[in-house]
Design a protein with these regions (language model features):
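Bacterial N-terminal signal peptides that target proteins for export
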Residues: 2-12
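Bacterial N-terminal signal peptides
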Residues: 11-23
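An exposed, glycine/acidic-rich loop-and-rim segment of catalytic or binding clefts
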Residues: 24-62, 67-388
Length: 388
């Protein structure tokens, strides 16, 4: 039995009450307003290139700010149960913070999100060697992944909402990957309190591709402390166990009877320090969950509720997996927005994705994109509040 602090026990009790209300989760009352999208300067890169911030606001007042460097989501303001707006994502106040070595706060990650074992794979008889940046492995595209490049950006608006489209071309051989890859990632904020991400990509040579978004959430608000009391539901009967370097073993293991069973809603803190070899391997949760699906349509993947604020987050995706990461490597050395020091487990990520190291696991869903075909996927984050 894992020891649970009195504070966490109280939080879990509140979460249980909210769980009973989750089917009635609703957005805050509509406020009179008009959706808008604006563009403003956000600093200059060492190369001399200018970076811009795009601010998306829906009719209800929810606001997303993102920059064209890394497609990074700077802030995301949503209301709590009392109607008070707070920023619910981790990050920095200025560009300088993101230019340092960071834990991918808010960024688009690729060309291959997550890990590739030993930084190598074989494709069509040729072996490719990638830049390694995570022990022996390649992580999130390598040393200069999509999180560290300037994207071309343009505002968008259609019947669904306001947005910004980011486009980037990754040249053949960059970080060791084959093929010139053109990627378009569109962020859209709707008046239904949805933040949708649409990914598209084409290539001129066969290449592995795995795109994701690496935002760290804290539904109590940025700088509000740990997320151990957040109640998480993940629609997955299985997960992919990992070795000591966080590379999947190839097994699709049942979550039943393990700390990885989030099918009915569990507080993050209940199992995060369990005496389980997989928990020890990740220092908490840093694992891919195999979503329950029968096709590649948009399906519900996860739900998070914060009993302190009443905020809820639902995630739907066309991807086969989601990486649940609990900020285990935040160590108190990073100072973020408004002087907040980010300590262990101060945020969580739900990174929709294909499985880690898929190029080396033919039994996993394929991540190989070939010329003449287009990769496309969609992820939707929906924000709400539980009724009082």
């Amino acid at each position: 039995m894992t020891f649970v602090s009195a504070r966490l026990a109280r939080t879990v009790a509140a979460a249980v009450l909210l769980l009973a209300q989750l089917d009635c989760t609703s957005s805050p009352e509509a406020r009179t307003g008009k959706a808008s999208a604006t563009r403003a300067p956000f600093g200059v890169l060492p190369s001399g290139d200018s970076v811009h911030v795009f601010t998306l606001t829906n009719a209800r007042g929810i606001e997303v700010r993102a920059i064209d460097y890394g497609g990074i989501i700077l802030s995301l303001r949503t209301p709590d149960q009392a109607g008070k707006f707070d920023d619910i994502v981790l990050g920095y106040d200025d560009l300088a913070g993101y230019l340092k070595s960071t834990p991918y706060f808010g960024a688009i990650v690729g060309r291959y999100a997550n890990r590739i074992a030993k930084g190598q794979f074989t494709l069509d008889g040729a072996t490719y060697h990638l830049a390694t940046n995570n022990g022996p492995n390649a992580l999130h595209g390598g040393i200069t992944g999509f999180d560290k490049v300037l994207w071309k950006a343009e505002p968008t608006q259609d019947s669904t909402g306001v947005g910004v489209a980011f486009t980037y071309t990754s040249r053949d051989g960059v970080e060791g990957y084959p093929g010139t890859l053109t990627v378009r990632v569109t962020y859209t904020l709707t008046d239904r309190d949805e933040f949708a991400i649409a990914y598209r990509a084409t290539t001129d040579k066969a290449t592995p591709l795995n795109l994701s978004q690496h935002t760290y959430f804290n539904l109590s608000g940025d700088g509000a402390g740990d997320v151990l009391g957040h109640l998480v539901t993940i629609d997955a009967d299985r997960y992919t166990p990992v070795d000591t370097t966080l590379i999947p073993t190839g097994e699709l293991a049942s979550v039943a009877g393990t700390p990885f069973d989030f099918r009915k809603g569990v507080a993050i803190g209940l199992g995060i320090d369990a005496a389980h070899p997989q928990i020890k391997a990740g220092g908490g949760y840093d694992h891919n969950f195999v979503l329950n699906r029968t096709n590649d349509s948009l399906v519900h993947a996860a739900r998070v509720v914060d009993p302190r604020s009443g905020r809820t987050l639902d995630v739907a995706t066309t991807q086969p997996g989601v990486q649940f990461y609990t900020g285990n490597f935040l160590d108190g050395t990073l100072t973020g927005k408004h002087g907040h020091v980010y300590s262990r487990r101060n945020g969580f990520c739900l990174e929709t994705q294909h499985f880690p190291d898929s190029p080396n696991h033919p039994e996993f869903p394929s991540t190989i994109l070939r010329p003449g075909t287009e990769f496309h996927s969609r992820t939707v984050y929906t924000f709400g509040v539980a009724p009082k």
